[in-house]
UniProtKB/Swiss-Prot annotation:
InterPro entries: Ribosomal_bL19, Ribosomal_bL19_sf, Translation_prot_SH3-like_sf
Protein family per UniProt: Belongs to the bacterial ribosomal protein bL19 family.
GO biological-process terms attached to the record: translation
Gene Ontology, cellular component aspect: chloroplast; ribonucleoprotein complex; ribosome
Gene: RPL19
Protein's name according to its UniProt entry: Large ribosomal subunit protein bL19c
Length: 233
C-alpha cells in the first residue's frame, strides 16, 4: 500500500530540469560548501528522475489495470445492445400479431354469463306456472270489487255435493295462486261474509252475474250501512 501511495506523493514535485533543491542554509542554520551543494543537487535530480520513472510505471500499471476491463465492458454492452435490437423488434411484432387472435379465441370460448335468479323471482315464476295450470283446468273470469258473483263449491265434508253461494265482492287480495275474494250477503237479516280461494280445486264454477262500478277497492263500509245496500236480485 505504501509503494502505491509514494509515487502519488512524488508526482507533486515539478519536473523542471533546471530546478535545484532549495538552499539548506536557512533550514539547517549553517553554511554548506559548493561540493556538498552539488552533491545535493545531483541527489535531488536523481530523486526527480526516480519519481518520474515511478510515476510513469504507476500510471502505466494503473491504466493497464483499470482501462482494460472498461474497454471490454463497453464492447460487451455494445454487442448486447446490437444483438438485442433485432430480436426485440421481432418479438414485439409477434406479440402484436398474437394478441388479437388470443382475444378472439377467448371471446368465442367464453359462454354467456347467466343472470342470478333471486328467491322472489323464483316464487313469482312458480306462481305464474301454477296459475296457468289452474286456468287451463277451469277458466277464471275477470272479477272486480262490486261485482255480483255466483260460485258453485264442492264440499268434501258433505259427500262432495255442490253448494251455491251468491253475493257481492267487497274485496280482492291478489297473491298469485293464493288469490282470494271476499263475498258478502244478507241471510235472515244478518250480514255474512265468506272468503273463497279463487284458484281452489273445490270451486267448480264461478259466474259473474252483474258488474257494478264502485269508487273504492274495498267495500268494508257496507258493514255499517243498512242491509238493503248489500242485497241484490
Amino acid at each position: 500500500m505504501a509503494s502505491k501511495v509514494l509515487p502519488q506523493a512524488l508526482l507533486v514535485i515539478p519536473s523542471n530540469h533546471s530546478l535545484q533543491c532549495p538552499p539548506l542554509k536557512k533550514q539547517l542554520g549553517f553554511p554548506i560548501d559548493s561540493n556538498r551543494r552539488f552533491s545535493l543537487s545531483s541527489n535531488c535530480r536523481s530523486n526527480l528522475m526516480v519519481s518520474r520513472a515511478s510515476s510513469n510505471l504507476f500510471s502505466s500499471n494503473f491504466s493497464s489495470i483499470f482501462s482494460f476491463p472498461a474497454r471490454n465492458s463497453f464492447v460487451v454492452r455494445s454487442e448486447a445492445e446490437d444483438s438485442s435490437d433485432a430480436p426485440a423488434e421481432s418479438v414485439a411484432v409477434v406479440a402484436e400479431e398474437e394478441l388479437p387472435v388470443e382475444s378472439e379465441a377467448e371471446a368465442e370460448e367464453r359462454p354467456p354469463r347467466q343472470q342470478r335468479v333471486k328467491l322472489g323471482d323464483i316464487m313469482g315464476i312458480l306462481n305464474k306456472k301454477a296459475v296457468h295450470a289452474a286456468e287451463e283446468l277451469r277458466p277464471v273470469p275477470g272479477i272486480r270489487t262490486g261485482d255480483i258473483v255466483q260460485i258453485r263449491l264442492e264440499v268434501p265434508e258433505n259427500k262432495r255435493r255442490l253448494s251455491v253461494y251468491k253475493g257481492i265482492v267487497i274485496s280482492r287480495q291478489n297473491a298469485g295462486i293464493h288469490t282470494t275474494i271476499r263475498i258478502r250477503r244478507i241471510i235472515a237479516g244478518v250480514g255474512v261474509e265468506i272468503v273463497f280461494p279463487l284458484y281452489s280445486p273445490n270451486i267448480k264454477e264461478i259466474k259473474v252475474v252483474s258488474h257494478r262500478k264502485v269508487r273504492k277497492a274495498r267495500l268494508y263500509y257496507l258493514r255499517d250501512k243498512l242491509p238493503r245496500l248489500s242485497t241484490f236480485k
